[in-house]
C-alpha cells in the first residue's frame, strides 16, 4: 500500500505557491490532488473571485477534511499566517499520514504582493512556520522562490 502523504505548500502572498505547486506536485512528488482556495474562488466567481473568498476558504477546509478522512494523498497551499492546521497535522499523522511542509521564502516583504496586511501575514507566516509548524511535520524544506529558479535553503524532519 503506498504511503499516505500530505504536502503543505506555504509562504507569503506573492511567493509563487500555485506556480511552484503546478510543477512540484505532479512531477516531483506524484501528487495530483491540490486544494487551493484561490482556485476554488475563481471557479465560484470567475469575474470577481474576491467576492467568493470566504466561501472558497470554507470549501477548501471541507475538502481537506474529506481527503484526510478518505486516506487520499493530497496537497494544499497556505500562508501559515494562522494556526488552523496545528491540530490537523497531529490528527493526520495519527491516521498514518506523512506530512511535509515546503515553505517558499522571499528575501523581503517587498517581494511580496502588497502593503500592510501582507506585511503582517509575511511575518506571522514565517514565525508560525519556525515556531509552530516545523516541529510538528515529518519533513520540511525552505526554498528561496524569489529567483527565476527555486533554490533549496534548508531541510529537515523527524521520523
Predicted segment positions?
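Conserved substrate/cofactor phosphate-moiety recognition/catalytic segment
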Residues: 21-72
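Pre-Walker A (Motif I) flank of P-loop NTPase domains
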Residues: 2-7, 70-72
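Conserved GTP-binding G-domain of TRAFAC-class P-loop NTPases and closely related GTPase folds
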Residues: 10, 108-159
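Glycine-rich phosphate-binding loop used to anchor ATP phosphates in small-molecule kinases
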Residues: 55-106, 121-122
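Conserved beta-strand scaffold positions in the cores of enzyme catalytic domains, especially
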Residues: 34, 99-101, 140-142
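Walker A (P-loop) phosphate-binding loop of P-loop NTPases
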Residues: 14
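Conserved lysine of the Walker
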Residues: 17
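Conserved nucleotide-binding/hydrolysis micro-motifs of P-loop NTPases
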Residues: 27, 39-41, 81-82, 105-109, ...
Amino acid at each position: 500500500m503506498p504511503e499516505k502523504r500530505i504536502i503543505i505548500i506555504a509562504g507569503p502572498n506573492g511567493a509563487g505557491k500555485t506556480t511552484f505547486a503546478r510543477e512540484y506536485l505532479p512531477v516531483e512528488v506524484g501528487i495530483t490532488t491540490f486544494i487551493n482556495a484561490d482556485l476554488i474562488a475563481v471557479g465560484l466567481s470567475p469575474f470577481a473571485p474576491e467576492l467568493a473568498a470566504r466561501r472558497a476558504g470554507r470549501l477548501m477546509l471541507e475538502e481537506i477534511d474529506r481527503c484526510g478522512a478518505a486516506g487520499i494523498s493530497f496537497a494544499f497551499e497556505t500562508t501559515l499566517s494562522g494556526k488552523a492546521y496545528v491540530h490537523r497535522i497531529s490528527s493526520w499523522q495519527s491516521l498514518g499520514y506523512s506530512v511535509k511542509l515546503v515553505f517558499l521564502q522571499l528575501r523581503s516583504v517587498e517581494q511580496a504582493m502588497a502593503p500592510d496586511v501582507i506585511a503582517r501575514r509575511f511575518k506571522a507566516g514565517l514565525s508560525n512556520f519556525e515556531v509552530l509548524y516545523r516541529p510538528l511535520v515529518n519533513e520540511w524544506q525552505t526554498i528561496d522562490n524569489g529567483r527565476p529558479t527555486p533554490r533549496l535553503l534548508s531541510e529537515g524532519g523527524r521520523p
